[in-house]
Swiss-Prot record:
TPR repeats lie at residues 290-323, 324-357, 366-399. This is Dynein axonemal assembly factor 4. Keywords: Cell projection, Cytoplasm, Neurogenesis, Nucleus, Repeat, TPR repeat. GO terms for molecular function: nuclear estrogen receptor binding. Interacts with ZMYND10. Interacts with STUB1. Interacts with ESR1 and ESR2. Interacts with DNAAF2. Interacts with CCT3, CCT4, CCT5 and CCT8. Interacts with DNAAF6/PIH1D3. Residues 3-87 form the CS domain. InterPro entries: CS_dom, CS_DYX1C1, Dynein_assembly_factor_4, HSP20-like_chaperone, TPR-like_helical_dom_sf, TPR_rpt. It comes from the Eukaryota. GO terms for cellular component: cytoplasm; cytosol; dynein axonemal particle; extracellular region; neuron projection; nucleus; plasma membrane. Involved in neuronal migration during development of the cerebral neocortex. May regulate the stability and proteasomal degradation of the estrogen receptors that play an important role in neuronal differentiation, survival and plasticity. Axonemal dynein assembly factor required for ciliary motility.
Length: 420
């Protein structure tokens, strides 16, 4: 049974009540204060202080200060008035219990509201942080898009400048050809004049004894005109026999059927042209040639302009999707730009088109395996990468660089297995 404390002191003004309560030597850590607008309780075992306040107070702005073995309360009144007593008099036990329960419910509701307000504030903070993060990501995405657009514009300008240079070079060549033709025509005219003069001299010498008449000059002129017209050329025919292509493979190792199939696929690939593309109407004839676009992409790759090179290979593939070297070269560009999945796709497509395997396409197949293996290794798929490198070594066992890289991949795989 706690001991009720009655030796407290209090003072008041119209707006504030000052209450001083001695702790009687109890440690501050063991003191519990509970306060609502009508009820104040201080529990510091074995002592207990309860006050059923005379009028409501503002418990949120009220304060309690502990020091010198005393608690000093500063209680702000809700209504400015003087109290007759600190606690309400004539309150029975049931009334006290109801006030206690009501105060506890009020405190619980206030704590619940505070918790909900704190949770709502936390949600708002999270929402704000998410919106800021999304804004930053959007700015980064826009920055990347702008960089891509700038690169595309730069590549387009370079391509246009190169086209203009080619056009001017062609115009210069055309002017030079026309000048040469004019010079040849002048030479031919001079030669004809000389021939006419020689013919005229011979005719005059042969007709010295002939009678001179009035129309002799006209007859000679007509004869000269007839002689100056060359006779029609004789018709002839030339027979051409093409030399059949011979593969440099020993007869005992020959794959004649596969080699013929490979030649047939190459011929079909050169004929497979897709001209139903809207952009073709703005291009020159030479720019509609996949071979020309492939060479252009190779030059751009050599200058490390990989995005422009990919654009050139893309258009070439749209024109002709049967040329394996286009996919093989585009895979190299994707490797440089770290587009590893696209590099794997292009290398696989190149290997698909480089069938059947013959000596003529061995080097291209070796490169395709190496590029796909490199992409797998950069994705940390070392087993798949080693399989491609071993396939490349089967094609070219004497390639020292591929041997060294394959050995490095084996060491990485063995190290990973040991760690696991």
């Amino acid at each position: 049974m706690p001991l009720q404390v009655s030796d407290y002191s209090w003072q008041q003004t119209k707006t504030v009540v000052f209450l001083s309560l001695p702790l009687k030597g109890v440690c501050v850590r063991d003191t519990d204060v509970f306060c609502t607008e009508n009820y104040l309780k201080v529990n510091f075992p074995p002592f207990l202080f309860e006050a059923f306040l005379y009028a409501p107070i503002d418990d949120e702005s009220s304060k309690a200060k502990i020091g010198n073995d005393t608690i000093v309360f500063t209680l702000y009144k809700k209504e400015a008035a003087m109290w007759e007593t600190l606690s309400v008099t004539g309150v029975d036990k049931e009334m006290m219990q109801r006030i206690r329960e009501k105060s506890i419910l009020q405190a619980q509701e206030r704590a619940k509201e505070a918790t909900e307000a704190k949770a709502a504030a936390k949600r708002e903070d999270q929402k704000y942080a998410l919106s800021v993060m999304m804004k930053i990501e959007e700015e980064e995405r826009k920055k990347i898009e702008d960089m891509k657009e700038n690169e595309r514009i730069k590549a387009t300008k370079e391509l246009e400048a190169w086209k203009e240079y080619q056009r001017k070079a062609e115009e210069q060549k055309e002017i030079q050809r026309e000048e040469k033709l004019c010079q040849k025509e002048k030479q031919i005219k001079e030669e004809r004049k000389k021939l006419k003069y020689k013919s005229l001299t011979r005719n005059l010498a042969s007709r010295n004894l002939a009678p001179k008449g009035r129309n002799s000059e006209n007859i000679f002129t007509e004869k000269l005109k007839e002689d100056s017209i060359p006779a029609p050329r004789s018709v002839g025919s030339i027979k051409i026999n093409f030399t059949p292509r011979v593969f440099p493979t020993a007869l005992r190792e020959s794959q004649v059927a596969e080699e013929e199939e490979w030649l047939h696929k190459q011929a079909e690939a050169r004929r497979a042209m897709n001209t139903d593309i809207a952009e073709l109407c703005d291009l020159k004839e030479e720019e509609k040639n996949p071979e020309w676009l492939k060479d252009k992409g190779n030059k751009l790759f050599a200058t490390e302009n990989y995005l422009a090179a990919i654009n050139a290979y893309n258009l070439a593939i749209r024109l002709n999707n049967k040329m394996p070297l286009l996919y093989l070269n585009r895979a190299a560009c994707h490797l440089k730009l770290k587009n590893l999945h696209k590099a794997i796709e292009d290398s696989s497509k190149a290997l698909e088109l480089l069938m059947p395997p013959v000596t003529d396409n061995a080097n291209a197949r070796m490169k395709a395996h190496v590029r796909r293996g490199t992409a797998f290794c950069q994705l940390e798929l070392y087993v798949e990468g080693l399989q491609d490198y071993e396939a490349a070594l089967k094609i070219d066992p004497s390639n020292k660089i591929v041997q060294i890289d394959a050995e490095k991949i084996r060491n990485v795989i063995q190290g990973t297995e040991l760690k696991s």
